[in-house]
Structure formats: structure tokens, C-alpha cells
Amino acid sequence: MTRFEFFDHTADIGIIAYGRSLEEAFESAALAVFEVMTDTSKIEYKVEVEIEEIGSDLENLLYRWIESLLVYYDSDLLLFGKFKVSIDLNNMTLKGKAYGEKFNPEKHERRTVVKAMTYHEMLISQNDGTYILRFVVDI
């Protein structure tokens, strides 16, 4: 199964992430965001970061998850290439782990920096057992 794909969006980047579960789709969404910034296959898993978020709804939970990851890039130049997510829909909470390392210009390709997550065109759906997350990131 394809984990994610990109779609054209004026001045920003659109992402469609897929998963066999909601958790896997959230993991794919995070991977796609970092793939915009670098080749995630070159990221080693030297650092583990734990993230806990509470959302008002599923869209807000996705927004908070991606924004939290971007804060680590903005503050510590951390790039992530692997994720593990657990979601409690009853309490609308997310517990996640992100694995990666600090950006190294000699090792990591510098692509487009993602500035922020947005709610623009955000849609979370399920089709034939596949969860689909569609959203736009600001670059």
C-alpha cells in the first residue's frame, strides 16, 4: 500500500496519507511531512521523542500531531523518519513516538521547509478499510 502522495496546491503542498488503521494513517502523514523536507530514508533513528496530544475532534488531533513534530524541527532541527502512534477515540487523545536525528547538511538533502500545518482542505475518511487523511502544509 502506498503510504502517501502529494497533490498540487498553490504556494503550499497537499498531502494524502493512507493507512490500514487510523494510527497507521497518522504515521504516514507525519512521514509525508518530513519527506517534503528531506529524503527520510537517510534518517537514522538516534533520537526518540514522545508526544501526547488532546484534540477537540479528529481533525484537530491530526493538526496538533503534525504541529508538535514541526516544533521539534523548528527548535532543535530534528528530522524524523519513523513514527508509532496510538489513538484513543473516546477521549480524543494521541500518544506518539517519533524517531530520528538532528539535521546534518552533509548527510541530509535540504528540500522545502514545512512552516506549519493547516486546516485547509483537511479531510479524514475511510474507504474499503483504508483510512485517508488529506491536508495542506504551509511552505
UniProtKB/Swiss-Prot annotation:
Cross-referenced InterPro entries: Archease (IPR002804), Archease_arc (IPR022952), Archease_dom (IPR023572), Archease_dom_sf (IPR036820)
Protein residues bound to Ca(2+): D12, D138, I139
Keywords: Calcium, Metal-binding, tRNA processing
GO biological process: tRNA splicing, via endonucleolytic cleavage and ligation
Listed SUPFAM superfamilies: MTH1598-like
A GO term, aspect molecular function: calcium ion binding
Annotated family: Belongs to the archease family.
Function according to Swiss-Prot or TrEMBL: Activates the tRNA-splicing ligase complex by facilitating the enzymatic turnover of catalytic subunit RtcB. Acts by promoting the guanylylation of RtcB, a key intermediate step in tRNA ligation. Can also alter the NTP specificity of RtcB such that ATP, dGTP or ITP is used efficiently.
PANTHER family, per the entry: ARCHEASE (PTHR12682), PROTEIN ARCHEASE (PTHR12682:SF11)
Protein name: Protein archease
Lineage: Archaea, Thermoproteota, Thermoprotei, Sulfolobales, Sulfolobaceae
